[in-house]
Amino acid sequence: MEERLRNELSIEKAMIIPGDSDDTPWVKTEMGKACANCMKKLLKGENIIAVTGGSTLAAVAEMATPQIGDGLLFVPARGGFGEDVEHQANSICSKMAEKTGSKHRVLYVPDEISPEMYETFIKEQKINEVLQLIRSANMIIHGIGDALKMAERRKTSPEVMEFLKRE
């Protein structure tokens, strides 16, 4: 299944940890350990690591250790939303940097904005700098969550919620 996922996404490495993290909390801990071990093996020298949010990535951050590597820079792969700051990419980057003795950057923009607002935001030097770092990341740690739960947290419109339920 990992090979199929690698081929489908055209990526070098994919890892699947057995279990259902919704039913068995220790699965997220195991995912965190596996991710930390993978990072230790793959990261040599200076690296930019883009990180998404969510409870799984928060568990990964808890398993990070200084042995993962030197010269790491963690950047959020997305902005923030809602009030659950603990599971936002900015917070997870901060925790990973703290646990590994590395650096991190933040991206203080909402997840969902209009195209006009996006154009305004990217003109801001600090935001543009972080966006460039995200684009140059040589590793992305991306969680996969339940689309309906994420949409509810983001207070998605009823029309989009109906679409997600149908699909």
Pin down the residues of each PLM region.
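Gly/Ser/Thr-rich loops at beta-strand to alpha-helix junctions
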Residues: 49-59, 82, 146-148
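Ligand-binding beta-strand-loop-alpha-helix segment within the catalytic cores
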Residues: 3-37, 41-45, 69-167
